[in-house]
Amino acid sequence: KAELHTFISKESNPSFSLGFVPTMGALHAGHLSLVSAALAENSLVVVSIFVNPTQFDNPNDLSSYPRKLTEDVQLLETLSKPHILVYAPTVEDVYGSQPTADHFDFGGLEFQMEGKFRAGHFDGVGTIVKRLFEIVQPKNAYFGEKDFQQLQIVKKMVEITQLPVHI
């Protein structure tokens, strides 16, 4: 985290704009599209690669989630490497010794659609996005629209916490 802040502060100037694309890795064309959009609008883009344990209700799903950090970094290098910073924290970096999710009142949105079948999933999503926003401190953050419910959850979390991040 300290290295991330040191690097970003060296790059910072009055016209500096930091974009952020949070991912769980296993990057694909959709992720690259988000990173490209972020590169077009920001001085520097941080791409996080973090498999978040608090959004999995099934430990088998967590353990079987693909982790391809080397391949993901190579894929990002096909874009504009000098303007992309990969942040791949450990669970301890983000949560300390005990990964737990915060509870958010998403106004019932968390119980609709996918939320009906994945208890606590969106508290985990809200928690990790909030923590990553606090660590990275971006001006702009980019999320795919494919997962409409998750996008709405993130927007609601930003509204609740009043974090100064444009989605």
PLM-predicted stretches and their roles:
Residues 1-167:
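Nucleotidyltransferase catalytic core that binds NTPs
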